[in-house]
């Protein structure tokens, strides 16, 4: 098993660099930085992290094939790989409708766009002249002018078709989930894609990109994660909620509270214990270890501690290092 950690660049970059250095010291393998237009730039942030760390791998968690041309993405991640001494990982997924609507970008054929973009990016990183006349991605003989080196490509994937594609074409899969029930389904879909491509499914790193909250006081850990879980519930398909025995009608109630900014209602019981169990790794070190072991038994090979990490981020990083990574 490897252990990753996610940071959102809504915080100042040097603050994130401090956390990344601490995570490296505590034995984390990977740091993942989210990519969203209203936060600090993902590649600028990762470059600062590269210059403030020595061994931890540095990934986009995740970027998308719409806001940047595939050649630009290849150049950016290749530059990061050079600066970091070969520590870059490209995490790329289809993104989501609401973000692109806000940006005025047409979100068309996400499965095809993701697949063709990965093929083009692999070509650029390999130093090839890329000529492509795909359904969505087209190049007329573009080529990078420097050697990028080997960069693993991970896919952010949720739905069955994306998970199968990840098994076909990616080195790893970042899945926003925390519960064994979700991975029982996902691991099978990834394996089906790998077998379709003639690959061993074990070649694909399966990462639980989880809402994570750890503290010696379980109640404090739970409280820190409730708002994050509320957003997860509000954005979950009915099928996923039903898998966990959660009434889909609760999604509308929680979504309404979020829209009103009524976080008191969310913290006051609207986010139930069953929701916390379904959509987070949360509690004391022993609580978190128990869930992690369940995920490893199903086929998860990387745990990513995503937001909020804990009620106190610095203490949580140290606690994970001491009590879980060991």
Curated annotation (Swiss-Prot):
Question: Does the UniProt entry include the keyword Cytoplasm?
Answer: yes
In Gene Ontology terms, what is a biological process of this protein?
Answer: methanogenesis, from carbon dioxide
Class in the EC hierarchy, top level: oxidoreductase
Which NCBIfam families does the UniProt record give? F420_mer, PRK02271.1
**What catalytic reaction does the record list?**
5-methyl-5,6,7,8-tetrahydromethanopterin + oxidized coenzyme F420-(gamma-L-Glu)(n) + H(+) = 5,10-methylenetetrahydromethanopterin + reduced coenzyme F420-(gamma-L-Glu)(n)
MF (Gene Ontology): coenzyme F420-dependent N5,N10-methenyltetrahydromethanopterin reductase activity; oxidoreductase activity, acting on paired donors, with incorporation or reduction of molecular oxygen
By its UniProt entry, which Pfam families does this protein fall under? Bac_luciferase (PF00296)
For this UniProt record, give its keywords in alphabetical order, as a comma-separated list. Cytoplasm, Methanogenesis, One-carbon metabolism, Oxidoreductase
Name the protein family: Belongs to the mer family.
- Can you say what this protein is called? 5,10-methylenetetrahydromethanopterin reductase
What residue ranges carry the coiled-coil annotation? none
Query: Function, please?
Result: Catalyzes the reversible reduction of methylene-H(4)MPT to methyl-H(4)MPT.
Superkingdom assignment? Archaea
Compartments where located: Cytoplasm
Metabolic or biological pathway, per its Swiss-Prot or TrEMBL entry: One-carbon metabolism; methanogenesis from CO(2); methyl-coenzyme M from 5,10-methylene-5,6,7,8-tetrahydromethanopterin: step 1/2
Assign the protein's first listed, main location to one coarse class. cytoplasm
Enzyme Commission (EC) number: 1.5.98.2
Q: Which GO terms describe its cellular component?
A: cytoplasm
């Amino acid at each position: 098993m490897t252990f990753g950690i996610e940071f959102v660049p809504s915080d100042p970059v040097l603050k994130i660099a401090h956390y990344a250095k601490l995570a490296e010291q505590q034995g984390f393998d990977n740091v993942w930085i989210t990519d969203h237009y209203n936060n600090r730039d993902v590649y600028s942030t990762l470059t600062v992290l590269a210059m403030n760390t020595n061994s931890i791998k540095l990934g986009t968690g995740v970027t998308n094939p719409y806001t940047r041309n595939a050649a630009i993405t290849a150049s950016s991640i290749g530059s990061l790989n050079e600066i970091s001494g070969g520590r870059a990982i490209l995490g790329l997924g289809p993104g989501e409708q609401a973000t692109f609507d806000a940006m005025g970008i047409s979100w068309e054929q996400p499965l095809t766009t993701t697949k063709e973009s990965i093929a083009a990016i692999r070509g650029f990183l390999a130093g090839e002249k890329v000529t492509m006349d795909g359904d969505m991605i087209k190049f007329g003989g573009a080529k990078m002018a420097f050697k990028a080196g080997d960069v693993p490509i991970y896919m952010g994937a949720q739905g069955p078709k994306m998970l199968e594609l990840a098994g076909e074409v990616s080195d790893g899969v970042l899945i926003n989930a925390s519960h064994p029930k979700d991975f029982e389904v996902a691991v099978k879909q990834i394996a089906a894609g790998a077998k379709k491509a003639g690959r061993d499914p074990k070649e694909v790193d399966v990462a639980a990109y989880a809402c994570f909250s750890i503290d010696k006081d379980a109640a404090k850990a739970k409280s820190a994660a409730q708002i994050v879980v509320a957003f997860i519930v509000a954005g979950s398909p009915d099928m996923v909620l039903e898998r966990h025995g959660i009434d889909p009608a609760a999604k509308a109630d929680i979504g309404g509270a979020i829209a009103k900014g009524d976080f008191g209602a969310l913290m006051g019981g609207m986010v139930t214990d069953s929701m916390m169990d379904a959509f987070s790794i949360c509690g004391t070190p022993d609580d978190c270890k128990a869930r992690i072991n369940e995920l490893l038994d199903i086929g998860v090979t990387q745990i990513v501690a995503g937001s909020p990490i804990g009620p106190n981020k610095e203490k949580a990083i140290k606690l994970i290092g001491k009590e879980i990574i060991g």
